[in-house]
């Protein structure tokens, strides 16, 4: 759970549909008995589609998490169309049996949200990234890296829901959106990001690590930095012995040259 979404297990976007299906199923059951079976099947399908279970979230600062459940359909170097820079592109396709809530792949601050109208071709196709209805979130991670994650509507999905805006701070795994009934999410990362998945891999939202973003020296673990400084300031006994031996050799060479 998080501060913006305190209702796990069943996504709130599905409450009206599930409630309506349950009421209709009960009504038809009382009137028509077994003829209500299709309505019960629909209600059960809606329950599984709108499930939104709580999950453990990896806290490795280098890890970029999968924002959704699904299957990897793209891992390639591409152009981020929202920043006009080269990037590592990773795309996840969601079928109707996957969890469809979207969650932040990293601790980040949203800098811009861009919505584009478009078509509704099969989200499994490459052209869906540029032709379909889509909503892009441009953000800067806690370590200062720029990332973009894009909700893409699919053949059946006709409504993208995004609950974040420019200036908002998202925690890794924090819920920020939802797409109904099959869709896709594109993630654009800096080119030095190291992909941890391959095409065809099945991923689990916020549990699977899509890629790792290397940290610069200035962003390294302060404990490690302190240890390095201490080592430099206090050389080991072995280092001291080596330096003493080098000084003796240098002195001996100078004596020979004087003679």
From Swiss-Prot:
Protein EC: 4.1.1.65
Described purpose of this protein according to its UniProt entry: Catalyzes the formation of phosphatidylethanolamine (PtdEtn) from phosphatidylserine (PtdSer).
Known cofactor(s): pyruvate
Enzyme class: lyase
InterPro entries membership: PS_Dcarbxylase, PSD-A
This protein's GO CC annotations: plasma membrane
Membrane topology label: Peripheral membrane protein
Annotated positions for site Cleavage (non-hydrolytic): 182-183
Residues at the active site: 183
Record's subunit section: Heterodimer of a large membrane-associated beta subunit and a small pyruvoyl-containing alpha subunit.
Posttranslational modification: Is synthesized initially as an inactive proenzyme. Formation of the active enzyme involves a self-maturation process in which the active site pyruvoyl group is generated from an internal serine residue via an autocatalytic post-translational modification. Two non-identical subunits are generated from the proenzyme in this reaction, and the pyruvate is formed at the N-terminus of the alpha chain, which is derived from the carboxyl end of the proenzyme.
Keyword entries, A-Z: Cell membrane, Decarboxylase, Lipid biosynthesis, Lipid metabolism, Lyase, Membrane, Phospholipid biosynthesis, Phospholipid metabolism, Pyruvate, Zymogen
HAMAP family: PS_decarb_PSD_A
Modified residues (Pyruvic acid (Ser)): 183
Gene: psd
GO BP annotations listed: phosphatidylethanolamine biosynthetic process
Pfam family, one: PS_Dcarbxylase
Annotated GO MF terms: phosphatidylserine decarboxylase activity
Pathways involved: Phospholipid metabolism; phosphatidylethanolamine biosynthesis; phosphatidylethanolamine from CDP-diacylglycerol: step 2/2
Reaction catalysed by this enzyme: a 1,2-diacyl-sn-glycero-3-phospho-L-serine + H(+) = a 1,2-diacyl-sn-glycero-3-phosphoethanolamine + CO2
Family named by the database record: Belongs to the phosphatidylserine decarboxylase family. PSD-A subfamily.
Protein name: Phosphatidylserine decarboxylase proenzyme
Principal location: membrane
Subcellular location: Cell membrane
Co-factor binding details: Binds 1 pyruvoyl group covalently per subunit.
